[in-house]
Amino acid sequence: CIRDSNKNLHTNDVVLGKTVKYLDTDMRLIGQWKPFASEFNSDDYLLKVASKVLTDMKITHIAGTIASGGYFVDSPEKVAEVIAATQADAVEMEGAAVLHVAARNDVPALVVRAMSDNADTKYEDFHTFDISEYADTAAKITVNILRNL
């Protein structure tokens, strides 16, 4: 599930993870080992290809900052904390780990996240993002990215 903190983005818009940061991890210790980083970046070439694909598909998107954490950002206070700590455009739970492992193993990678709701949407009220409907769009995005590599 993704929670967006950028008010210019709306449900079904996409954030390409140019920079992805752990939200609730102390990076002082982790950053002492390869890849010696406190944040992680999607591969520049993959970002370029994905951006072209999304533009061609007329999907609103940005290449921005994504924060990955182990909790839902579901209140204005949590949104403010996340923005202050990370300047994130979106919040989710897996992207930093994916890019961290990829960077550690020298593998180019890309994090692509669709907005499912606003960061201040209560979890119980979360219903405007239809995952089954968006799965078709996600598959088309993935296939088009692969075709353009």
Where do the PLM segments sit?
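Short, hinge-like loop/turn segments at secondary-structure boundaries
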Residues: 13-16, 109, 128-130
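Generic structural signal for well-ordered, non-membrane alpha-helical segments
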Residues: 39-47, 75, 91, 95, ...
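A C-terminal functional module that forms or caps the active site or interfaces directly
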Residues: 72-124
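Active-site loops and adjacent core secondary-structure elements that bind or stabilize anionic groups
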Residues: 1
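A structural motif corresponding to the C-terminal end of an alpha-helix
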Residues: 53-61, 101-107, 141-148
